[in-house]
């Protein structure tokens, strides 16, 4: 059952705001991974490639951390993750 914003407590509204921010951050991390991967394909310098590969791994860690936070704040989303993982 969905609720209108008028029926939500300040705490529920704050959680929704936090979730919106976290989801936007998640999008940013995924876009960064894609961008670094594209750059790797264009780079010729091996040190630069290695550095970007390392950065991609860090970005993937950020994705995992954000997904965990989102699941903690959104039980319905957590349930969806459980169904597909």
Residue locations for each model-derived region?
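Iron-associated oxidoreductase/ferritin-like identity signal
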Residues: 1-85
């Amino acid at each position: 059952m969905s609720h209108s914003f008028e029926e939500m407590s300040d705490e529920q509204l704050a959680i929704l705001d936090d979730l919106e921010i976290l989801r936007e951050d998640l999008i940013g991390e995924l876009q960064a991974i894609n961008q670094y991967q594209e750059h790797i394909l264009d780079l010729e310098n091996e040190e630069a490639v290695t550095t970007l590969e390392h950065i991609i791994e860090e970005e993937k860690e950020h994705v995992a951390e954000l997904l965990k936070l989102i699941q903690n704040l959104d039980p319905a989303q957590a349930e969806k993750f459980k169904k597909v993982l």
